[in-house]
Amino acid sequence: MEGLLIHAVLRELEKELPAQNLGLAFPEEGTAAILLKGRTGRLFNLVLHYRPPTPSLALEPGRLQGEPKTPFQRQLQARVKGPLVEARQLKLDRVAFFRFAGEKGFVDVPPSVLVLEATGR
């Protein structure tokens, strides 16, 4: 995925930040979908396709389904908690950073940064 396309998706996403994180779904082995409720009330998924040769990201409406299938997906589900407070890209690089605030609860989850490197092979 080209840096300009990533920039366009992030620009659209920034209009909705901070966005409430309503949970993760894993429709495929190489895909994570984070259900978000944006600042405007819009409900959408931040969909990350992270498996080469064509990693990408997109904003999609509706609710996607799927349980974690790999240890990596189980780690994502355990650590990506709290509102999405920032989405950024360095220059027009093919790397995107998503900062989540974490959450307080029975077991506190610290803030985390999810990095998507959409460079392919």
Where are these regions (language model features)?
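Gly/Gly-Pro- and Ser/Thr-rich, intrinsically disordered tail segments characteristic of DNA damage-repair
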Residues: 1-121
